[in-house]
């Protein structure tokens, strides 16, 4: 089964993404994973301002802080490499979700990352339900895969 088009994103490795050894600097990976998630939301139809604080529109009433992240590096990634970032989001419960990212070079897995988010009320900072738009994105992203209720 192929992924929905908003779950597969391309990225070319730039010189500024690399370290003195000429390979991707370790800290780039989680940034790429987050940027891919942001682009995926936009491709799905959710504007950045409707999800993230600091946009030009009204401020969202729900914040989605990252409460856990990790990354694994499997092969060197170098300047000019054309990467595919494949997202595999999963709802964990009504107030949290994880976005797993696979980074592929010529269909070979070269890295992976994980970002776990929890929904909190922007004013009280207490856990709350996911925003409707993000909830719809998660539901649409899981079509074809069985997920627990």
Curated annotation (Swiss-Prot):
SUPFAM superfamilies documented for this protein: Thioesterase/thiol ester dehydrase-isomerase
EC number: 3.1.2.28
InterPro entries, alphabetized: 4-hydroxybenzoyl-CoA_TE, DHNA_CoA_hydrolase, HotDog_dom_sf
Keywords of the record: Hydrolase
Pfam families per record: 4HBT_2
Function: Catalyzes the hydrolysis of 1,4-dihydroxy-2-naphthoyl-CoA (DHNA-CoA) to 1,4-dihydroxy-2-naphthoate (DHNA), a reaction involved in phylloquinone (vitamin K1) biosynthesis.
Protein name: 1,4-dihydroxy-2-naphthoyl-CoA hydrolase
């Amino acid at each position: 089964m192929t992924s929905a088009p908003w779950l597969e994103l391309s990225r070319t490795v730039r010189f500024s993404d690399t370290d003195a050894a000429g390979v991707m600097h370790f800290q780039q990976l989680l940034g790429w994973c987050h940027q891919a998630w942001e682009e995926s939301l936009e491709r799905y139809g959710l504007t950045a301002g409707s999800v993230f604080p600091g946009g030009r529109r009204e401020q969202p009433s729900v914040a989605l802080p990252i409460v856990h992240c990790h990354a694994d590096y499997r092969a060197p990634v170098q300047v000019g490499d054309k990467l595919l970032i494949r997202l595999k989001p999963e709802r964990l419960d009504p107030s949290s979700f994880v976005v797993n990212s696979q980074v592929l070079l010529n269909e070979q897995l070269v890295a992976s990352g994980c970002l776990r988010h929890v929904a909190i009320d922007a004013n009280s900072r207490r856990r709350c339900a996911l925003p409707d738009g993000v909830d719809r994105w998660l539901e649409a992203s899981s079509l074809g895969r069985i997920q627990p209720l």
